């Protein structure tokens, strides 16, 4: 349910119920970028399969982000995707990015890399009134350290993960 009045989200509900997605998108429950929650639990298997088939982390993130954007737009009809070049200084902007780390074992006999460990996460940030803020998991809302989040290079470092995929932008309709 859409609710941009943050006091209703963060004072009426326990803070732990809201993550980066619920904060940025204005929903009152923990937000996952999937239509069916079971889909998110299968994500690691999909990542492993793509990696075994020779895809690198960057390509895997881009494939996942395409699915996520479709799901986000389906779940949140009050927002639209916007190209970075069309963003105006007064727009309230939501930015979305992924992090992915894969550690694997190389098997020379099969000439394959087997993923032993996969760590994947998503993150949203929002710019309102020219200020970028975020909410990491069940933590407090905070102002982003670096306010130049239109940079595609580098990472969004939340202290937990480094988000390095391309950035997807949304705005409220």
Describe these PLM feature segments.
Residues 12-39, 43, 57-58, 62-66, ...:
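Active-site nucleophilic cysteine motif
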Residues 15, 34-36, 82, 136, ...:
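Short, isolated positions within intrinsically disordered regulatory regions of eukaryotic proteins
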Residues 42-139:
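...with weaker cross-activation on analogous glycine-rich loops/strands in unrelated enzymes
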Residues 10, 29-31, 77, 116, ...:
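Residues in intrinsically disordered, low-complexity segments of regulatory proteins
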Residues 1-14:
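Active-site-adjacent structural segments surrounding the nucleophilic cysteine of cysteine proteases
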Residues 18-20, 53, 76, 112, ...:
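Generic recognition of cysteine residues
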Residues 131-173:
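Active-site or metal-binding loop neighborhoods of secreted/extracellular toxin and effector enzymes
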């Amino acid at each position: 349910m859409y609710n941009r009045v943050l006091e209703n989200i963060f004072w009426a509900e326990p803070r732990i119920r809201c993550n980066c997605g619920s904060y940025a998108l204005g929903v009152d429950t923990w937000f996952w970028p999937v239509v069916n929650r079971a889909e998110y639990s299968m994500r690691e298997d999909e990542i492993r399969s793509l990696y075994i088939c020779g895809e690198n982390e960057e390509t895997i993130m881009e494939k996942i982000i395409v699915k996520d954007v479709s799901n986000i737009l389906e779940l949140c009809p009050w927002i639209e995707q916007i190209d970075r070049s069309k963003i105006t200084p007064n727009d309230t902007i939501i930015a979305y990015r992924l992090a992915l780390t894969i550690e694997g074992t190389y098997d020379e006999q099969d000439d394959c890399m087997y993923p032993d460990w996969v760590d994947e996460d998503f993150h949203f940030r929002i710019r309102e009134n020219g200020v970028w803020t975020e909410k990491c998991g069940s933590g407090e809302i905070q102002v982003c350290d670096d306010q130049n989040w239109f940079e595609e290079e580098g990472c969004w470092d939340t202290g937990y993960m480094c988000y390095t995929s391309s950035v997807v932008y949304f705005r409220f309709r």
